[in-house]
């Protein structure tokens, strides 16, 4: 009987120990739903196909000229919002300079596409001086943000082409 009690106690202790994480738990978003980004890839990941965060906060100027062999943004760099989500892009006083050297590389002519009826992107600049800048090397029709469905709200900040 004593052996059985000890085994039960040992089993309970083992179950307790195995339930406690030994490594720190990491999360994509902070407790308030904010994700901080400092590159175009991080910005794309935070806005593309995810509902894990509600605020995407730019924490450093983002420059895209050096991407893809210094030709800037290409087709695979386009941000697609194709599912129901409500995101705030906080420029936080920083500049996002989206550069595309060749129109053929960004065939759609846009860099952010909102294409779901329940997708909403709000752009704000909580600090002041923040901007989305589209820099295109060729004389073609470009849109920084295309809204085929869904909603785009511009609370503050600047968009320059």
What are these regions (language model features)?
Residues 1-10:
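Bacterial N-terminal signal peptides that target proteins for export
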Residues 11-19:
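Hydrophobic core
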Residues 19-33:
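Sec-dependent signal peptide cleavage junction
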Residues 30-59, 64-69:
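Acidic Gly/Asp/Thr-rich repetitive segments characteristic of extracellular carbohydrate-active
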Residues 61-62, 94-95, 127-129:
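Acidic glycine-/aspartate-rich tracts in secreted/extracellular proteins
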Residues 64-88, 97-125, 135-152:
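Extracellular beta-strand-rich solenoid/capping regions of secreted or surface-exposed proteins
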């Amino acid at each position: 009987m004593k052996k059985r009690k000890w085994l039960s106690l040992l089993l309970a202790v083992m179950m307790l120990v195995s339930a406690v994480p030994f490594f720190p738990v990491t999360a994509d978003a902070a407790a308030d739903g904010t994700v901080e980004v400092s590159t175009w890839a991080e910005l794309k990941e935070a806005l593309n196909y995810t509902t894990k965060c509600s605020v995407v906060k730019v924490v450093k100027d983002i420059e895209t000229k050096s991407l893809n062999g210094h030709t800037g943004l290409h087709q695979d760099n386009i941000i697609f919002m194709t599912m129901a989500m409500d995101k705030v892009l906080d420029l936080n006083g920083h500049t996002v300079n989206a550069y595309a050297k060749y129109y053929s590389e960004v065939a759609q002519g846009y860099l952010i596409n909102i294409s779901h009826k329940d997708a909403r992107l709000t752009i704000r600049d909580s600090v002041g001086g923040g901007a989305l800048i589209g820099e295109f090397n060729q004389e073609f029709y470009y849109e920084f943000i295309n809204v085929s469905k869904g909603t785009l709200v511009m609370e503050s900040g600047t968009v320059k082409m």
